[in-house]
Amino acid sequence: MFVFEYYNAEYEYSYVNGSLTIDKIMAKSVRKNVGSFDLTRATLVAKVNSQEALGKARQQLRTYNCSSGVDDPGDIVIYTYDNDSNEMIRLFMLPDDSMKEAIVSAIGNGVAHL
């Protein structure tokens, strides 16, 4: 039974002043911080299957998959830098419309291809 206790995982996104913090909530009781990412340094924000994202898909980067785990047309990919290690990372997530608008307004249309 213990195996299935953590099967139900949800992600909580918090976006404040250009910093995106992601927490993973397992079994609706245990919260774990996935990471904090500086979106003001993002080089690309795009839909997962867009030409821009597919052009960078072969880069070998640390990848965080914080999406639903199912192919969803709303999934986006963000290429940015990890606040702790200062290395380029790839982040998959499924934000709602208000989160998408906040990200685009903070980083500008030159980087965002949504």
State where each predicted segment sits.
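Short amphipathic beta-strand/extended segments with alternating polar/hydrophobic composition
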Residues: K32-R41, M88-P95
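Cytosolic, membrane-proximal regulatory domains of ion/volume homeostasis and mechanosensation machinery
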Residues: N49-V70
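Polybasic/polar functional segments that serve as interface/processing modules
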Residues: M1, T21-I25, G110-L114
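A membrane-cytosol interface segment of integral membrane proteins
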Residues: T63-L114
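Membrane-cytosol interface motif
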Residues: V16-N33
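Short, surface-exposed charged micro-motifs
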Residues: E10-E12
